[in-house]
């Protein structure tokens, strides 16, 4: 299995010979949204705050399917949707998102299922996620995903979520070998924290002591509250720096089969 950090929450996954792209967001630096951060200076800064590490054509080379955990401007936006081959299979969190993606012109859109979908030997399982600190404040429908395949590590991509009972259930049920966390700790005016921050990552370390944890969704949007450097420092102080990998954009990690 290979996991390549592209930018933000966009990652490439190679599993059992299949190549998946999660949450493609290909806008150029400074041409997207300026999210309403509580920090007035950050609120003025347009996202993305970094460029892609590679050309879009290189990122998309060999991709067999895309997975969209939710429709937000920093996960799958209309500009990115217009760039890509509309015949590529796409897995969506729910029927509403499926319809939105079909509205972009995509012709092979499927809904992820809690019971799993077999995609050429790789089973994709939808998991719970909560995109905010409470159900009332959650920023729309979102999911995580489990990838399972013969002789491969079990991978859990938690998606845009805080640490809560739903994440605990996924960790307990699937016992993943590798866990990808969106860990920038973003905040929006009036909504509070949207995804995991440093303390949440520490909670996952304690809940999944035998898993390799990867921190993604870092250093690319204006409303982030945790940087890679800050997360590394926090984990070092808590003795967990050897438990969590924090890849730079473009970096590829490889894991042996189980």
Question: Which role does the model predict for each range below?
Answer:
Residues 1, 85-90, 153-155:
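Short active-site oxyanion
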Residues 5-16, 118-177, 196:
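Catalytic core of the metallo-beta-lactamase
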Residues 18-67, 78-83, 134, 163-173:
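Pre-active-site segment of Zn-dependent metallo-hydrolases
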Residues 22-23, 62-71, 91-94, 155-161, ...:
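Active-site neighborhood of phospho(di)ester-bond hydrolases with catalytic His/Asp-centered motifs
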Residues 27-29, 72-76, 98-100, 115-118, ...:
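Active-site environment of divalent metal-dependent phosphoester hydrolases
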Residues 31, 47, 53-118:
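Active-site HxH/HxHxD metal-binding segment of metal-dependent hydrolases
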Residues 59, 92-152, 233-258:
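Metallo-beta-lactamase
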Residues 162-249:
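Cap/insert and terminal regions of metallo-dependent hydrolase folds
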